[in-house]
Amino acid sequence: AVSASLKENSVNIQKFLEPSAGIGSFIQSFAEKGVQQVTAYEKDFLTGKILKQLYPDNTIQIKGFEEIPEKEQNSYDIIASNIPFGDTAIFDLSYSRSRDMAKVQAARSIHNYFFMKGTDMLREGGILAFITSQGVMNSPKNDPIRRALMHNNNLVSAIRLPNNLFTEYAGTEVGSDLIILQKNSDKQILTQAEEL
């Protein structure tokens, strides 16, 4: 649905990244829309091998998103994924040793890290669409992360998804949100919705 919506709105997509590919649902939907440059990261070895077989024409990296080269910063048109969540810390020295306290905090929980690192990888005007736990928007301790994200991105949409959305697929009921951001590093003010 994300890829179809972007195509319907004439969003030019040349370069797509899925930072936590899993079974490749986003890869498939964007490839079907004619996106030529598709890169995916999948940390699990077996899942990554399967992805390479399913999508031989795409760049599949069997490693964690934290290993994406710095030269890839500011280069992707679209980044979309159903990202992992939890208090798992990420080993990324550029974050844990950063002077930016939001980056330091982001390295302490995987979902916050994916948001911050994802926006680093977007070109100006690029779109990030992540399905994530409700903790990103709900948790008071994530306030510095939300502020950092809103400082450098426009909030396109934030949708609270039904708790049973993944019941049939993954056998779990978890509160999830779809958050869509557009990179805007020159942003001067927050909208009323972004201040919430």
Question: Over which residues does each language-model region extend?
Answer:
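Glycine-rich, phosphate-binding/catalytic loops in enzymes
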Residues: 34, 57, 95-99, 145-148
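Short, solvent-exposed polar/charged micro-motifs at secondary-structure junctions
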Residues: 69-72, 167-171
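Conserved S-adenosyl-L-methionine
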Residues: 1-88, 132-135, 151, 179
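Mobile active-site "lid"/loop adjacent to the S-adenosyl-L-methionine
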Residues: 84-113
